[in-house]
Regions:
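A short acidic-Thr-Gly-centered motif at the start of a beta-strand
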Residues: 3-4, 25-27
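Pre-active-site segment of Zn-dependent metallo-hydrolases
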Residues: 17-22, 29-67, 71-88, 92-98, ...
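Extreme N-terminal starter segment of soluble prokaryotic enzymes
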Residues: 7-12
Length: 115
């Protein structure tokens, strides 16, 4: 588990590292822990099944979740946060906030159909 607070800032790529979809990055500093994006993996059925495997990062200790923009590969798994024990605020622009309900509904439909 990546729940320790580091002595200096660390960045851990949890998705979209060497690939395009599934954006998720953990930023840890001595002052807090922030997840940047929590997106869907898309492509093959095997890729999409990866959406069911969530990294063990101590979700209940996350201080904030930042959504960079309203594409499912960046925000498609935001709806999982309460189930993971994460009650951190989700921070984004107003335009992204306005689009999130529609994007998350679409994300849920994609997951139900394909996985």
């Amino acid at each position: 588990m990546l729940g320790r607070v580091p002595a200096k800032a660390t960045i851990t790529l949890l998705g979209a590292a060497g690939e395009v979809t599934g954006s998720c990055t953990l930023l840890q500093t001595p002052r807090g822990r922030v997840v940047i994006d929590f997106g869907l993996f898309q492509g093959s059925v095997a890729d999409e099944r990866r959406n069911l495997v969530v990294p063990d990062i101590g979700w209940s200790t996350i201080d904030a979740v930042v959504v960079t923009h309203a594409h499912v590969d960046h925000c498609g798994r935001i709806g999982m946060l309460p189930r993971l024990g994460c009650d951190a605020p989700v921070l984004c622009t107003k335009i992204t906030a306005d689009l999130l309900p529609r994007v998350l509904k679409s994300s849920a439909n994609l997951q139900a159909i394909r996985v």
